[in-house]
Amino acid sequence: MLQPASRRAARHTSTSALKRFFAIADAWELSPLQQCRLLKIPSPQVLERYRLGQAPRLSATQQERAALIANIQYSLTADAGLKDRAWAWVHAPRKSPPFDGDSPLYFMLENGLPALREVARLLVRESEPR
């Protein structure tokens, strides 16, 4: 059985993951619907409850989605002072695979968790020293 302390810790993890997600969502200028699709939240009404801290804890899959989005943002802003680069990178159409002319944001919205994993991996590879 879960101990209350570990339940509190899990709730804290979920809360900080959400805080980070909403900060990134604001930086990327995502609509409520886009935020729902990225985190797999059923509706903007439920999303608003998450924003207000009134919704249930994130599921493991939702936590993974939030963590991947945080990793993507971190990869894009690792060089100090390039906050705008993240916005531009996420929104600009890219010819290279796997995007094939779509923006990374569109790719992630359309293809869900596998796409989030792929984009996070791609950015880690790009940032490795050659």
Where are the model-predicted features located?
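Non-transmembrane "mature" sequence context
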Residues: 1-130
